[in-house]
């Protein structure tokens, strides 16, 4: 339906393809890896029928959006989401993320706050990395990062976490 420019690379615009349908309270659907905004086509009709304004977009590097050589980190994804919300002048927004999209929502809230948001939904969410590291200086100490999680869960999650880390 349209594009939103979120930056430039080598004097070329970085554009995100988006679709904006319906009216009412806006709900922004954020796809997972390696999908695009079309992955929500099964949910969109019901949301439109329920009276929502439904916005989907292809994250940079996915679908019909630009494929720049940089910017594939959650800070940039969150900033791109912020540009989408600002450009479309969205308020009282419901953000729904699937898989990788949940990390984008979490980072968005951390970087840009909740002023534009009414609700968020995390579907098939990524496990957060809680421990303090060089690239996560605000995390919890290692003695606390897993303190509320049963050791058997951590043991069975390690292969999944390792796989997810390698994919992203």
Where are these regions (language model features)?
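Alpha/beta-hydrolase
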Residues: 155-168
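Short beta-strand immediately N-terminal to the catalytic nucleophile in serine-hydrolase-like folds
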Residues: 95-97, 123
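Gly/Ala-rich beta-loop-alpha elbow adjacent to hydrolase catalytic centers
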Residues: 97, 101, 105
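Flexible "cap/lid" loop of the alpha/beta hydrolase fold
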Residues: 106-155
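Conserved HGGG/HGGXW glycine-rich cap/lid loop of the alpha/beta-hydrolase fold
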Residues: 9-70, 84
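Conserved acidic catalytic loop of the alpha/beta-hydrolase fold
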Residues: 75-93
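Structural signature of beta-strand start/N-cap positions in the alpha/beta core
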Residues: 26, 51-53, 91-94, 116-119
